Regions:
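Bacterial Sec signal peptide processing site at the extreme N-terminus
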Residues: 29-47
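Register position in tetratricopeptide repeats
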Residues: 57, 91-92, 125-126, 161, ...
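Terminal, low-structured helical/coil segments at or just beyond the last alpha-helical repeat
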Residues: 211-261
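Structural marker of alpha-solenoid helical repeat scaffolds
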Residues: 74, 108, 142-144, 178, ...
Length: 261
């Protein structure tokens, strides 16, 4: 799948991870690295978790493992530390271990949207689409607004992966209604599909964006490039005119004027 489904970077109460340098600073404040205090300090466990996930997203797997293992050792009953290890095990391809860890986390936090979304993403990555959708559907029933948007988005991309276009369109459109900021990720995905030469997938994502959100310079530029590639000169000029009227100072309009498709 070209769009990551994992919600690991938003594991801690829906907030993105801090930069590595900031996490190091916090770690030094709450207790010296590898000091005896670290073994029982819950704040250190959360900092180790954040640090491990930051290393994971930067693909520094050895450092990620070391910090996530320390987080689990300090706070083994905290579902967040166990979920962090599940994400690591999933990343390195230890799917059997990840499955066991996810089941453990589900028992620890059965009504948690982040757990459901991450487990659903894991199942979707294995092609277990029906089981994945059960997790996403359960997460979508939770009252937390952001978790509903995440669940709809993940379910939509899972259907997108499975080639179930109608369901993908419906769910991704709903996700954008809940959280319009998700349009940024959708356009990024559409650009990746376009660069990979996947015209039908690109068209679908453009249509979802177009029918759900106001046009942006980036969305218009993608439509222009798509029309140019397809030889639809009328559409290319039409979108170019909209770009000129709405975003005359944008870099996308400068590319259009230079015919840099």
């Amino acid at each position: 799948m070209v769009k990551p489904l994992l919600q690991g970077l938003f594991l801690l109460h829906g907030r993105p991870l801090s930069p590595l340098s900031s996490v190091f600073a916090v770690l030094l404040l709450v207790g010296c690295v590898n000091s005896p205090q670290e073994a029982t300090n819950p704040a250190v466990a959360q900092t180790r978790l954040q640090l491990g996930l930051a290393y994971l997203t930067h693909n520094n797997l050895d450092s990620a493992r070391q910090n996530l293992e320390k987080a689990v050792a300090i706070a083994p009953q905290d579902y967040r530390t166990q979920l962090g290890m599940a994400l690591y095990e999933q990343r390195i391809g230890e799917n059997h271990l990840a499955e066991q860890r996810y089941q453990q986390v589900l028992n620890m936090a059965p009504e948690n949207g982040s757990v459901m979304n991450n487990y659903g993403a894991f199942l979707c990555s294995l092609g277990q689409y029906v089981a994945a959708q059960r997790q996403f559907s359960a997460a979508a029933q939770l009252p937390d607004y952001s978790q509903v948007a995440d669940a709809l988005e993940n379910a939509g991309y899972c259907f997108f992966n499975a080639g179930q276009i109608g369901d993908a369109r419906r769910l991704l459109s709903r996700a954008l209604k809940y959280d319009p900021k998700k349009g940024i990720a959708l356009l990024a995905e559409a650009n990746q599909q376009f660069s990979a030469g996947n015209s039908e997938q690109t068209r679908l994502l453009i249509e979802i964006y177009q029918h759900s959100l106001p046009a942006s310079a980036e969305s218009l530029w993608l439509q222009i490039r798509f029309a140019a590639l397809a030889g639809h000169d009328g559409d290319k000029e039409r979108y170019g005119n909209v770009l000129a009227r709405s975003f005359p100072q944008s870099k996308q309009y400068q590319h259009f004027l230079a015919n840099e498709y």
